[in-house]
A protein has these predicted regions:
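Membrane-interface segments at transmembrane-helix boundaries
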Residues: 44-55, 76-101, 219, 258
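Re-entrant/interfacial helical elements at transmembrane boundaries that shape
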Residues: 72-83, 113, 241-259
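Short intracellular "coupling" helices and adjacent cytoplasmic loop segments at the cytosolic face
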Residues: 45-48, 59-76
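Membrane-embedded alpha-helical segments of transport systems
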Residues: 60-68, 91-112, 235, 270-286
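Interfacial segments of multi-pass membrane proteins
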Residues: 81-89, 228, 232, 250-267
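Predominantly cytoplasmic-facing regulatory/coupling regions of multi-pass membrane proteins
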Residues: 1-59, 117, 121-237, 263-273, ...
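Hydrophobic alpha-helical membrane segments of integral membrane proteins
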Residues: 75-80, 93-96, 106-108, 196-197, ...
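Transmembrane alpha-helix interface/packing and boundary motifs in multi-pass membrane proteins
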Residues: 61-69, 214, 230-250
Length: 315
């Protein structure tokens, strides 16, 4: 997927109105995360919470992910939720991760819908088909974990009896599984609401991609956009632990746009560069939201949690 794409012609030729619309859709989709969170979080803690303010708080927390690997933005957001609304951090983190797992299952469904339209001719199609299958299985698996986290608790408890390294891994799995289980007793209606909000978020993300194509005067099949959104969202899981995700998002989107979108490799590379521009402009908006929540994020309790989340801090 190596492409020689000069970004300057992209910036010179892009239509700013459609680009701004794409950024707006991208930001709106991310803010809807607040509604998805409230659909799953225990009601006794969410009486004063509203979807859009919570969503802006989560999106503002993504600023921290620019400089630190791992789910630091998520930690910042749930610490801010505790500071602002009094919800226990463990409950907020569990509900957030649980909802994101369901979101990955919806991304897998979106990619699965586009699979029949993938061209498997040549190396690109084979890579897209094979990689897409793996990513879909990951998404479905994480969705299954979100519904039945009990097996993770049992596995973690068993591993704690092993060697030091396996014991530490088992302890982490057990704590994580117990956190998921703490909100995993929600009724099926709550799970369906989370899944519905996740699909809504995915649809707005696809709409952002479609308007970006209009900004670039690029014609792509809808199946390619669905495939790019589904596999791209799943590939970003790597980005939770490695800054930039080692190009997994770019590979997933380029492969999807070529294999199912009917565009050339160079046009797909151009689209990815423009998509990253949308992400950066969206993060600029998240910086504005961070400024609005600065008194919460910069409080001593939130800063303390972030220091504890830094790599090597507790080594």
């Amino acid at each position: 997927f190596t492409t020689d794409v000069d970004p300057w012609p992209i910036f010179a030729a892009i239509r700013p109105g459609w680009l701004a619309f794409s950024v707006g859709l991208f930001v709106f989709a991310n803010v809807l995360v607040g509604h998805r969170f409230l659909a799953l979080a225990p009601r006794e803690y969410t009486g004063e919470m509203r979807g859009f303010p919570v969503g802006t708080l989560f999106f503002a927390g993504s600023v921290f992910s620019l400089v630190l690997p791992g789910p630091v933005g998520e930690v910042a957001a749930v610490a801010a939720l505790r500071q602002r609304y009094g919800i226990p951090m463990s409950v907020a983190f569990a509900a957030s991760i649980h909802a994101r797992f369901v979101g990955l299952a919806s991304a897998a469904l979106m990619a699965l819908v586009a699979f029949p339209f993938v061209s498997v001719e040549g190396t690109v199609g084979q890579v897209v088909a094979g990689g897409g299958v793996v990513l879909v299985l990951i998404g479905v698996g994480l969705g299954a974990v979100s519904m039945r986290p009990g097996w993770m608790v049992k596995l973690g408890s068993g591993l704690t009896k092993g060697t030091d390294r396996m014991g530490r891994l088992g302890g982490s799995l057990r704590v994580f599984g117990e956190a998921l289980a703490s909100v995993g007793q929600a009724p099926w209606t709550a799970w369906l609401q989370v899944f519905g909000w996740s699909l809504c978020i995915q649809v707005f993300q696809v709409a952002a991609m479609a308007t970006l194509c209009l900004a670039l005067n690029l014609q792509a099949h809808v199946a390619g956009l669905l495939m790019a959104q589904g596999t791209g969202s799943l590939a970003l899981v790597v980005g939770m632990f490695l800054p930039g995700g080692l190009g997994t998002f770019e590979v997933a989107v380029i492969g999807s746009m070529v294999g199912a979108g009917g565009v050339s490799v160079v046009d797909a590379g151009t689209f990815v560069v423009a998509m990253r521009v949308v992400h950066l402009l969206g993060l600029a908006v998240s910086g504005v939201m961070f400024a609005a929540w600065a008194n919460v994020f910069l409080s001593s309790s939130v800063v303390g949690e972030l220091k504890g989340a830094e790599p090597g801090e507790n080594a």
